Amino acid sequence: MKRIIAMFCGLVTMLAFSFAVAAQTTRSVTVVLQDSSSGEPVGYATVSLTKAGANTASKYALTDDKGKAVLDKVSAGSYTVKAELLGYKNYSAEITVKNSVDLGIVKMEPDRKVLDAASVTAAGNPIIIKKDTIEYTATSFKTTDNDMLEDLLKKLPGVEVGSDGSVTANGQTISKITIDGKTFFLDDPQLASKNIPAKIIDKVKVVQKKSEQAQFTGIDDGQEETVIDLSIQKGMMNGLFGNVQIGGGHDWPENTTNGNGDWRYQGAGFIGRFTEKSQLSIILNGNNTNNRGFNDLSGSMMRSMRGGGGGMGRGGGGWGNSNGITTSWMGGVNGSWDLFGDKMDLGANYLFNGTQKDVKEISDKTTFLDDGSSLIYHNDGYSFNNSYGHRFGMRLEHKFSEKTSILFQPQFNFGNGDFQEFSKFTTDGIAAGETESVAKNEGFNNNTGNNKNWTANGFLLFRQRLGLPGRTLSFNIDYNFSNNDLYGFNQSLTKTFGATDAENVNAIVNQRYDQNSKSSSVSGRLVYTEPLGAGFYLEANYQYRWSKNKSDKLTYDSADRGAYDFNADTHEYYRETDMYDKDGNIIYVDGKPVHSNEVLNSQYSSNILNQYQTHRAGVNFMFQKDKIRAQVGASIIPTITHNETNGKSYDNSVINWSPTAMLWYDINDNMNVRGFYFGNSSQPTTTQLMPVPDNTNPLNVSLGNPYLKPYFSHNIHTRYGFSNRQKFLSVYANLSGGFVQSPIVYASWYNTNGTAFSLPVNGPTSGNVNARMFLNAPFGKSNFSISSSTSGSWSTSTSYVGKSSFDTSTYYVDGDFDYVKFHNDFPDLGKSDKFLENNTQTMNFTERLKLTYRNNFVEIIAGGRSRIAKSWYTIESANTNVTRNNQASMSMNWTIPGGLGLVGEFNYNWYKGYKTPQDDEYVFNLEITKLLFKNQCTLSLKGYDLLNQSKNLSVSDSSNYHTETWNNTLGRYVILSLTWRFGNMNNASKGMRGRGPGGPGHGPGPGGPPPMM
């Protein structure tokens, strides 16, 4: 006891001493730097303090985006304060520090000699790397008057825009886009990228943004995201501006296979008013050219309820976002205001959107089994999906004082939708050593339904500074609630062929199902930070998270299934009267409502409850001095899981611990290095835990697994940035990797009829490594510049494939899958004699190279890219080839005297190494524009894919299967549009005139083999 008391007293004494030391160093020197000519803040300048009589500085700080720098823990005495930044004359002054000193605003005088020496006439792509920010000067990249932000982003080195509209920067997905630091429509970057005119943008900044709580405490919590922050041109401020576009066109020649008509239309509008204190934007968009200008949250929720078994997903193409023809429309308003003398920052937005998607698909899949036999699947089908949604969002930040503030950000989503999917299928088998196929089965499946959903999520953050600089207390609450209802009909007929016609068996499914899924989660995180002196800080944190997911599904069979007949001419099964129509209305048969004859099917019904409780307690130590900052820490994470499935309970508890380590090192003003490590525990989804077969696709039955355990991820990330501001040379590189303990993988097997089954299980550790580097540089003071992007990745994962000796019927009792028996028989699938463990290793290498010539009238870009991929499988039935996806491209953007403009794009794609040879592809887009009415309007005629060669065939190969999938897609079409610009849109810097939204570069990319990543 005495020893414990002595240790406690010693600890108290040490803490008291550290507080006393910290109290003696509370003086600070504050300064704000501004350009003497423009009054703009001078960011990222070096401010230093040199004690009288000393030769070297004792304190350093960099100014932030607002030009402010604070040097903390300054001892009393006389100092020389200096401010330095390339392009400005050095500032120097003598000061005496007795208490904290505020130097106010210091005007930095531009150094004309340096600026003249560093100037490059229209050269290349000016990029500056500042700590965790990559800044692009938008006016250095040629865009047309009608281009959207998405067109500008495609020109930025290191930034990529996917065919689905997603944006990545240096391999990191962009989670949101802000305007001058203010969120634009919260967490939907597509709304900004597809609807904000490129002409109004001054700067594009790619920022590694920490969580709001980490920004306040200064200690990283691992919740980092990559965002894009836009700066608006000064000419667009303090006035109304906008543009409106309308256009129409036609497929050429007429395309009767897309199922959505041959006429093309597009309409878009953007109205904005921006000041230093407020932002207001109104956006409108509608088209049937696959240019959806928003993230379809309602459609995503509907798809998540249906799981992975529906549709034609086994064909490899599925009903994915890049397939088919999409018609979309939306309208929204976004605003933000600085109120009460900048003490309150208020933002709000509303959006309505709708999507109609039409997909046709034909797929063939060959599966190679371990006994030398193979199965050949053929599918032919279509799907129609409609979704509609409303979104409301708000962001409120209020500063009660310099020490106390709150941040509240709620969001609400309401949506509904409906779907119809139909496909015909056949399965043939080829025995080992044989060449002739034998029919296994044939049939069709038809799925219809509708969905209603809503979500409410957000967070509340309270922040408090406690006297000493660096001593803080913050508390954050996150919440997420959702409700999802799905009402559907599942109808199928599968005829399994026997040795004779008398042995043929028809399996009929005629079901109606009602499914409801509710989820609730609340978490709270308390963080306390304490300065320990000499640049050391301590953080203690505690987080509690509770979540509850409840899913109820009731499935009913029709007691009177009726008779199906086969039409030999159309190769279709039919009934004289269907049980239900596509809208879910009851069909009367012989005067009796089918609904009255329904019988509950317990095998496909379920009642599931999942509850999780996670505690996370951690300690972090941080050291910060001059140009280096380091952080180490650890957390202990006990997790309790409770699952109830159809009255049976499953409980599990696990304790994980997570070390963290981070390093920030600013080598100099132009070069920096970052390194991070984080660990995180995650839970299986409700769908993965649901022990109910999904028979939406009768030949591809997916099962859940109530025995799944949480998995733990380890992640490492490093970054390097270099920028030479005189030569406009920029280099950025990152290396990341990680591994997952007990990852969720899949076990799959086939029965004798060719039906595939899949079951999620916890597998052995998986891992991945990714590397990426980009370089951008001009050629001296010429109009040429070059950019290069190189990336590579490696990953390893495991799956399990059932042997031919595995008897599926052993685990079906009265039609129900026996999870207990399966779990007891196969506690470790890797050691089972009924399953093969397949380890997959995949390696990819991609190189992009682009040469740009640019002057005031024309921009010409020539480039190429090549993606090389190779996979290795431990159970491969044949050697896998090295596949190569290659592209050579050229584009021109030419402003012609007289208000004319010419924009052309040409891509040549060729593919090597695929089992099915792929034809070369030539895609040519062309647009002609004319300025009208004192340059306030632009008339545009554009043609997409003029050679009509866009592919709609995709090919994929894996360890034991080969898949080819055909989908409908947009082909060649022409469209005539008129764009009107008004207000301050004509005050922005003059760019090159040309295309508007929906033209070349906006439509769907080629289907083809897997895209180059």
Would you name each region that the model predicts?
Residues 23-24, 66-68, 89, 112, ...:
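Membrane-proximal, glycine/serine-rich, low-complexity loop/turn segments characteristic
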Residues 53-56, 78-94:
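A short, solvent-exposed loop/turn motif at the edges and junctions
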Residues 52-69:
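Short, acidic Ser/Thr/Gly-rich low-complexity loop/linker segments typical of extracellular
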